Amino acid sequence: QETWDRLPCFRFDFVVVRDGKEVARFRHWWDRRNGRCRVEGPNDQGKQVAAIFTLADRKGIAFVEGIGESDPALVAEIIQNGYERWVNDTYWAMMPFKLHDPGVRIRYARNERTLETVYDVLELSFVPGTGLTPDDRYWLYVNRKTHLIDRWEHILTGQKPPPSGASWEAWTAIGPVRLSLQRRIQGKPVMLRFENAAAPAAFDENVFNFASVRN
């Protein structure tokens, strides 16, 4: 946890794959030291947008198909959508490092056994008013031998039981931390991948100023 807290920057793509084909990609540059982000991806109309903003006040600039947006209302909308994308995608990528965030409630639910593995199951819930979706609930299946999460189940806001689930695969060292870079959604031909994951010491300033940047 302390190693993650000291990480200055984090870079990744949140990729949705359905039936073996990529259907969406959202690119993230998170300057954790200075509290700013760049989030790129398709909007609801299929146009490529980029939101560059500070997390503290959600102020910044926006681009649509590589052209700077000047309408303040549209800039605010793009940034808000980018912020919500950042909240969702970073949580999926690094949830093990957010277990002790303010407003998180965690308890030991039970242990479960398969023929080969014993799991300690942790239940996560949230204090009302925490985050964007405080009614979400998660169950983490922690492999007692490896101490890694093998899968999770969740009931998200507005969802009725039973829980949905996903396996946590491809645990990989990214800089000084380990992350699961692939989630296989239970009962659906869908995978979530975290590609181009990196933990650089800093980003080029062009990332937070220009309409387009390289990886």
Region locations from a protein language model:
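A sequence-level detector of short linear motifs
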Residues: 24, 50, 64, 69-71, ...
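A short, sequence-level motif marking secondary-structure junctions
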Residues: 28-34, 55-58, 75-78, 169-172, ...
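Well-ordered beta-strand positions enriched in small/hydrophobic/aromatic, beta-favoring residues
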Residues: 12, 39, 60, 106, ...
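Solvent-exposed loop/turn segments connecting transmembrane beta-strands
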Residues: 19-23, 45-48, 85-86, 131-133, ...
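Gly/Pro-enriched, hydrophobic low-complexity segments
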Residues: 113-212
